A protein has these predicted regions:
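Extracellular adhesion/carbohydrate-binding repeat motifs centered on closely spaced tryptophans
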Residues: 1-88
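Short, surface-exposed glycine/acidic/tryptophan-bearing loops
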Residues: 117-166, 182-184
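A mature extracytoplasmic/lumenal domain signature
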Residues: 34, 54, 73-75, 113-115, ...
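A short alpha-helix/helix-coil micro-patch that ends at or immediately precedes a cysteine
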Residues: 82-129
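Disulfide-stabilized extracellular recognition modules
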Residues: 159-213
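Surface-exposed patches in mature extracellular/periplasmic domains of secreted proteins
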Residues: 103-117, 130-140, 179-195
Length: 213
């Protein structure tokens, strides 16, 4: 049976209306039998996650069973996930990036969870459109805006086909534009996305830095 989404409203003590009893505006979902959906739920619109206790819809960046997930902040549809194996590949890339930087006297970059899920989402998008332009036609950095990530400087490296972190880093370091991003002194944070789609690997590096005041 198709589940139905709706916002739950209860009258507050002040006499006005608040979304949910606690006023948080969280969404819940009920199945055709009127039971609150909890846990994972998939329908024609996509995949969602509802809190196992309160049934509230996950939005934004959420850790579930030790894995990071990105859910649309408006609709709650899952946009990306980072499995343990994918994160291990991404972490190795970050390690190699920082080896390149520190060997040249540059500061190492800090792994940022928000950039990690943004990069994971971008990696999946590359399987639809291999470009710095997203499948919806917007530029790659709109995913940062959507997640509320503030930055003064930003960069993106993309790649496809390389089977290991060492190979993709070698290719990036032998490309002047990609190398410039990896060694950019203005960046201080990094997120790396890696995914396999139909047996084909896609890679993304996202960098951000603040303006010096």
């Amino acid at each position: 049976a198709k589940a139905v989404s709706k916002d739950v409203y209860q009258e507050s003590e002040a006499g006005d209306w608040a979304e949910n009893a606690d006023g948080t505006g969280k969404w819940v979902r009920y199945d055709a039998n009127g039971h609150m959906v909890k846990g994972w739920d998939t329908n024609n619109d996509g995949t969602y996650y509802f809190d196992q206790v309160y049934g509230t819809m996950a939005k934004g960046i959420v850790t579930i069973d030790g894995n990071l997930y990105l859910f649309d902040v408006d609709t709650g549809v899952m946009q990306a996930s980072i499995t343990t194996s994918e994160e291990a590949m991404a972490d190795r890339v970050i390690e190699l990036v920082n080896q390149e930087r520190t060997s040249r006297g540059l500061q190492p970059l800090v792994k940022d969870d928000r950039l990690m899920v943004a990069a994971a989402a971008r990696a999946k998008e590359l399987s639809q459109r291999y470009s710095h332009t997203r499948p919806n036609g917007s530029e790659c950095f709109t995913i940062l805006w959507h997640l509320g990530i503030d930055y003064g400087y930003a960069g993106e490296n993309i790649a496809m086909g390389q089977r290991t972190p060492e190979i993709v880093m070698n290719d990036w370091m032998n490309s002047s534009g990609h190398r410039a991003n990896i060694l950019n002194e203005n960046y201080d944070c990094i997120g790396v996305g890696y995914t396999m789609v139909d047996g084909y690997p896609y890679w993304v590096q996202l960098f951000t830095g603040d303006f010096d005041l």
